[in-house]
């Protein structure tokens, strides 16, 4: 008999699964900073979704799978009239909040946007709450939503710290699926073993490729992939709730496990245990709807636009621009050639620098075809060169710094070289929180005004900006405030 014949004995669960489940079921969040940051992250994320409702490319994807479907006690989709089953509501909310690339960001060996998990969290919490009320039970409070956000951020972010999925061609939404599955399963009241099963189901799924994020195939799926992942998480948690079995060595199984099939045989590495680190250090996009590796470059470009104007010059006088940057920026958004759609443009650092140099602004509308057709943009793009500075790459990976630096040097047609403008930390960085939060609140006010009349805006603001009041509010009551 061959000694290579595999044993059919069921193994113990992989330690990675155990650690995730122990964290969501046993860890008590005591960090006031994490809860406060989660509240700010919540309102910013919802505001991003409200702004996306102005874009038909997004709204065409929203609503029930089958038109006319009615779901008793369904979950509300903020800013719409939809009440949907939690799976489809998670997709709707997740697609909205990610559509314009304006919600939070986590940068490490893997990149991502942990607030994408809010799709599954909010849909499930609202659906549970409405069904609890119908059964004469208490609804969940918004504090439960904030706690789930903190834990989902932590799971996604801690795995991302040392493990690069992009290096093997996988999209980071796999981590949204895993994190959402874990916290949603806990929210649904699954047992520890059932949550283990649910998380294993998330890992055993075929995972999304990064094809839709890169030339020559960059496209709009990158705007709804996160909704798809968090929606799938709710579905898997509900499947596990039926008692469906899991796959305990889904990561480590020889030949057939995630590591061997999709991760070049390498096990995950971890920098730190799960706690509240990620939420406390999350990057908030405050100023510009731009891929985060370009945020500081856009800020520098805005400064240069002002400096040129003061000198009586303009972008027309620019002969060349050098962007001194970090390796991740080069890998993700350094892009030449034609840009065919908004998803292509908001992942091109040359485009995101050219627009503010020309116009003194960068808004979501600037990625649309009408603006992109201006020939001055591509002409200026062609004069921009990116170069890696190893020191900036080291600072990017340094846990004590976590900078996302870009430095712009402009050479004018007459040979004049302007002083380099270096921006190390974007406005939404932890090191600039005090400066950023008032502007984040203003961003939320602006997004509320896009969708609601003044009285409704004020009611939402009053609830959202008061930490204690928000935490105590039933989830269904809070989401009812966003109905139209």
Swiss-Prot record:
Which terms does the UniProt entry file under GO BP?
propionate metabolic process, methylcitrate cycle; tricarboxylic acid cycle
Q: Name one Pfam family in it.
A: MmgE_PrpD_C
Q: Does the keyword Lyase apply?
A: yes
Report keywords, A-Z: Lyase, Tricarboxylic acid cycle
Record keyword Lyase present: yes
Task: Give the pathway.
Answer: Organic acid metabolism; propanoate degradation; Carbohydrate metabolism; tricarboxylic acid cycle; isocitrate from oxaloacetate: step 2/2
The portions of this protein that span the membrane are none
Q: What is its EC number?
A: 4.2.1.79, 4.2.1.3
Tell me where on the tree of life, at the top rank, the source sits: Bacteria
- Reaction(s) catalysed by this chain's protein: (2S,3S)-2-methylcitrate = 2-methyl-cis-aconitate + H2O; citrate = D-threo-isocitrate
Q: Which SUPFAM superfamilies match?
A: 2-methylcitrate dehydratase PrpD
* Gene Ontology molecular function: 2 iron, 2 sulfur cluster binding; 2-methylcitrate dehydratase activity; aconitate hydratase activity
**Reported consequences of knocking out the gene:** Cells lacking this gene are still able to use propionate as carbon source.
Q: Name the family the entry cites.
A: Belongs to the PrpD family.
Function, in words: Involved in the catabolism of short chain fatty acids (SCFA) via the tricarboxylic acid (TCA)(acetyl degradation route) and via the 2-methylcitrate cycle I (propionate degradation route). Catalyzes the dehydration of 2-methylcitrate (2-MC) to yield the cis isomer of 2-methyl-aconitate. Could also catalyze the dehydration of citrate and the hydration of cis-aconitate.
Cite the record's note on assembly.
Monomer.
Q: What is this protein called in UniProt?
A: 2-methylcitrate dehydratase
By which gene is this protein encoded?
A: prpD
């Amino acid at each position: 008999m061959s000694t290579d014949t595999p044993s059919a004995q069921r193994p113990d669960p992989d330690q990675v699964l155990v650690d995730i489940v122990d964290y969501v079921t046993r860890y008590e969040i005591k960090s006031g900073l994490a809860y406060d940051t989660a509240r700010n992250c919540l309102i910013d994320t919802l505001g991003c979704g409200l702004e996306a409702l102005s874009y038909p490319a997004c709204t065409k994807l929203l609503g029930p799978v089958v038109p006319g479907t009615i779901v008793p006690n369904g979950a509300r989709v903020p800013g719409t009239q939809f009440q949907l089953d939690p799976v489809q509501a998670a997709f709707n909310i997740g697609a909205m909040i990610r559509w314009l690339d304006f919600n939070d960001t986590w940068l490490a060996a893997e990149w991502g946007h942990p607030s994408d998990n809010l799709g599954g969290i909010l849909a499930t919490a609202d659906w549970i709450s409405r069904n609890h009320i119908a059964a004469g039970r208490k609804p969940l409070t918004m504090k439960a939503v904030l706690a789930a956000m903190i834990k989902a951020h932590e799971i996604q972010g801690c795995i991302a710290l040392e493990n690069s999925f992009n290096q093997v061609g996988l999209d980071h939404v796999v981590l949204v699926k895993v994190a959402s599955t874990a916290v949603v399963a806990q929210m649904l009241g699954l047992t520890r073993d059932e949550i283990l099963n649910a998380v294993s189901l998330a890992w055993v799924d075929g995972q999304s490729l990064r094809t839709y994020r890169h030339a020559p195939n960059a496209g709009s799926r990158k705007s709804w992939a996160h909704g798809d992942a968090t929606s799938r998480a709710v579905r898997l948690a509900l499947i596990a709730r039926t008692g469906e079995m899991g796959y305990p060595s889904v990561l480590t199984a020889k030949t057939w496990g995630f590591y061997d099939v999709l991760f070049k045989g390498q096990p995950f590495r971890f920098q730190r245990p799960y706690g509240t680190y990620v939420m406390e250090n999350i990057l908030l996009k405050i100023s510009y709807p731009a891929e985060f590796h370009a945020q500081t470059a856009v800020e520098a470009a805005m400064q240069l636009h002002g400096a040129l104007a003061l000198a009586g010059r303009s972008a027309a006088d620019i002969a060349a621009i050098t962007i001194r940057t970090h390796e991740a920026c080069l890998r993700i958004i350094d892009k030449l050639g034609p840009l065919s759609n908004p998803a292509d443009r908001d992942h091109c650092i040359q485009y995101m620098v050219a627009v503010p140099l020309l116009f003194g602004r960068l808004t979501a509308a600037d990625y649309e075809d009408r603006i992109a057709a201006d020939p001055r943009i591509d002409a200026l793009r062609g004069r921009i060169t990116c170069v890696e500075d190893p020191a900036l790459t080291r600072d990017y990976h340094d846990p004590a710094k976590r900078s996302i630096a870009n430095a712009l040097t402009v050479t004018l047609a007459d040979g004049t070289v302007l002083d380099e403008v270096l921006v190390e930390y974007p406005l939404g960085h932890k090191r600039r929180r005090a400066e950023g939060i008032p502007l984040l609140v203003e961003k939320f006010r602006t997004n509320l005004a896009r969708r609601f009349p003044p009285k409704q805006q004020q009611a939402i603001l009053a609830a959202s900006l008061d930490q204690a009041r928000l935490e105590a509010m039933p989830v269904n009551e809070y989401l009812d405030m966003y109905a139209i």
